[in-house]
Amino acid sequence: MAMKSWLITGGAGCGKSSFATLLQQQFSPPLPCFSADVAVAEVMSRESTRSELVTAFGAQALTQPGEVNRHWLRDVVLPDPVLRRQLEGILHPPVLAALETARGEAETAGVNLFLAEVPLHYEIGGTVSADLVIVVASSRSVQVRRMMETRGLDEQTVHKFLDAQWPIEAKVERADAVIWNDGSLTSLEAQVLTLASPLLQA
């Protein structure tokens, strides 16, 4: 049986990672899940990436110890469409290459279902192939509250961050499946089970 690929996306603060973890745990052994966020962190740790960031944005792209200045990128680059596209041009190609490597390794290992968590799937043009695109969504107020609580950001910064992404409604319209995550963990678990049940019974 050919391996299937499910792509998990959605808005910041919607609980994509929680959903992905719960979905993984429905299967034994747990399904492999590629995380674009983890891949971005790995790419940013490379000396070559830091050099590209300095070339594109100047010395302020790095902190004094020479690490990527994530706060500056978040506050200055992400809200600016032109600068954001420059940043995406640096980060996205190696991240997408890592995704395809992980997919290939999963297929070689004989995995039946491969998961990929790609938060900006639609923002980068929906170029990642998948048999099913799942959008994990929440209301804006819940997104804001969660991001303030989990990331320690003030409300204004959160709104700037969210405004740099597609509206969650636009992602929902394009989804193959939608997980609405405004409620409790129990509600999220129930939706995960509903989605996974056909595969578990196969």
Named regions from a protein language model:
Residues G11:
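P-loop (Walker A) phosphate-binding loop of NTP-binding proteins
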Residues C14:
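ATP-binding Walker
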Residues S17:
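Walker A/P-loop
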Residues V38-N112:
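ATP-dependent small-molecule kinase phosphotransfer cores
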